[in-house]
C-alpha cells in the first residue's frame, strides 16, 4: 500500500496495482481485497491484478468482485446470505453455494439473497432484488422484499433459475 501511495505522489502515469504473491485462494483473496480495497478507495490505480496460487480464472473472478464491492464495476449478480443461527431450518450453506454457482451464468446487475428461515428471511432480504428462503420442506421466492411464491423446498433453485432467466423481460 505504501509503495503505491509513494509512486502515485510522484507520477501522473497510469498505474497497475496489485498485491504480489498474495497466496492461496483463501488467504490470497483476503490480502488482495484488503490491500486493493485500500488502494482503490484512495483513487489510486488504473488497472488491477489479483495474484493467487491457483486457477487464473479465480483471479479474474476475485478482481471483478473487489471492483463491484467498491462500486467501481457494474454487472454480475451479488449473492448475500444470512449467517447460520438457531432459526436456520434449511441446508443454508449448501443452498448458498448452489446459488453462487447458478448465478455465474448471468450478467445481471442485481442482488440475490439466500436466507435460512421463512420467518425472518423476507425481512432480511428486503434490500435484495430476489431472494429465496426455506425450512421444514417449504421454500419461498422473494421479489423486492415481497413473498411472491411458495414451493417445495426442493424446487427453490429451479424457481430462482426461472426468475433469473426472465429477469427484466
Predicted segments, located by residue:
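Catalytic alpha/beta core domains of metabolic enzymes, predominantly
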Residues: 1-107
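Glycine-rich beta-to-alpha transition loops that act as phosphate-gripper elements at the mouths
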Residues: 18-30, 112-120, 134
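Fold-independent oxyanion-binding glycine-rich loops
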Residues: 19-20, 42, 52, 85, ...
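Short, glycine-/Ser/Thr-/acidic-enriched flexible segments
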Residues: 22-23, 55, 87, 119-120, ...
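Conserved, mostly hydrophobic/aromatic
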Residues: 39, 82, 117, 125, ...
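Hydrophobic alpha-helical bundle architecture
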Residues: 95-126
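Beta-strand/loop-dominated core regions that host nucleotide or nucleotide-derived cofactor-binding catalytic loops
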Residues: 136-142, 146-168
